[in-house]
UniProtKB/Swiss-Prot annotation:
Keywords: Arsenical resistance, DNA-binding, Plasmid, Repressor, Transcription, Transcription regulation. Coiled coil: none annotated. It comes from the Archaea. Residues 37-129 form the HTH arsR-type domain. One of its GO terms (biological process) is response to arsenic-containing substance. It comes from Halobacterium salinarum (strain ATCC 700922 / JCM 11081 / NRC-1). Disruption phenotype: Deletion of the arsADRC operon results in increased sensitivity to arsenite and antimonite but not arsenate. Transcriptional repressor for the arsADRC operon. Induction: By arsenite and antimonite. This is Putative arsenical resistance operon repressor ArsR. Gene3D superfamilies: Winged helix-like DNA-binding domain superfamily/Winged helix DNA-binding domain. PROSITE patterns: HTH_ARSR_2. One of its GO terms (molecular function) is DNA-binding transcription factor activity. CDD domains: HTH_ARSR.
Length: 129
């Protein structure tokens, strides 16, 4: 059974009858939804969510958010049970996703959350029951 036939069956059940014109109209509406949900915003959002989909990266951004100030990369080592290389790699991924900023201060690199990173954490914190 094609997806169009299935849609027609659904519309018939829901509306008590459905012709080809109603199916075509509904397909147009669904295509508009698909166009609005896709595109560059979808790719960017998936990139951000991918950056958060790792325990080390998520813990780093939570630490930065709670700290409310810049932290040096060396300050994460005592808090995380991963290598310094893994911490640096995680911070780079969070920076590329636009969730943290990096600033060089002499020989040290300091990181802090961006407004977007903070907003995502506030939203996640607010969604817990």
């Amino acid at each position: 059974m094609s997806s169009t036939e299935r849609l027609q069956r659904y519309l018939t059940d829901e509306r008590g009858g459905c012709g080809d014109e109603e199916v075509a109209q509904r397909l147009d509406e669904l295509e508009e939804l698909d166009a609005a949900a896709g595109g560059p915003a979808l790719e960017a959002d998936v990139g951000v969510l991918s950056a958060l989909a790792n325990e080390t990266r998520y813990k780093i951004i939570r630490i930065l958010h709670i700290a409310g100030e810049e932290l040096c990369v060396c300050e994460f080592s005592p808090l995380l049970d991963v290598s310094d290389s893994a911490i640096s790699h995680s911070l780079s991924q969070l920076t590329e996703a636009g969730l943290v900023t990096r600033r060089k201060d002499g020989k040290w690199r300091k990181y802090q959350t961006t407004m977007r990173g903070d907003a995502l954490l506030v939203a996640l914190n607010g969604s817990r029951r």
